[in-house]
Amino acid sequence: MSYPVIGGDKVRASRGEIKIEEVLTKAGLVFEEEYSFPDLVSSSGRPLRFDFAVFNDEYELEFLIEYQGIQHYSPKSKFGGYSGLRKQQFNDMKKREYCKKHNIILIAIPYTDEGRINYDYIMNLYYAQGGY
């Protein structure tokens, strides 16, 4: 079951994000899309959103998922070229540091693994990071 978006309007989803949403839904996991924390913002003051937040039955946060499109790894004019890449990577770093500081499991799925996305793939990444 998906819950309302937190932090604003849903941005256009990529194929990888759509696939992740389908896996989470089919598995019956409770999740929210575009999840944000009030104290995690970009250098411009905008909330930094995670693609998915997955919750347990008590609605406590279990882990976060970020699908890393090509714009996370190389400059693309559609995403602001080199400047956009630097901003993206800075924001990615802030998200990783935030999760580490708050003991939150963050699963980052690179676009090169799009074809591998299924329930077992996601859960193996979760368990590899100490999930239970």
Task: Describe every region a protein language model picked out.
Residues 1-132:
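Nucleic-acid endo/exonuclease domains
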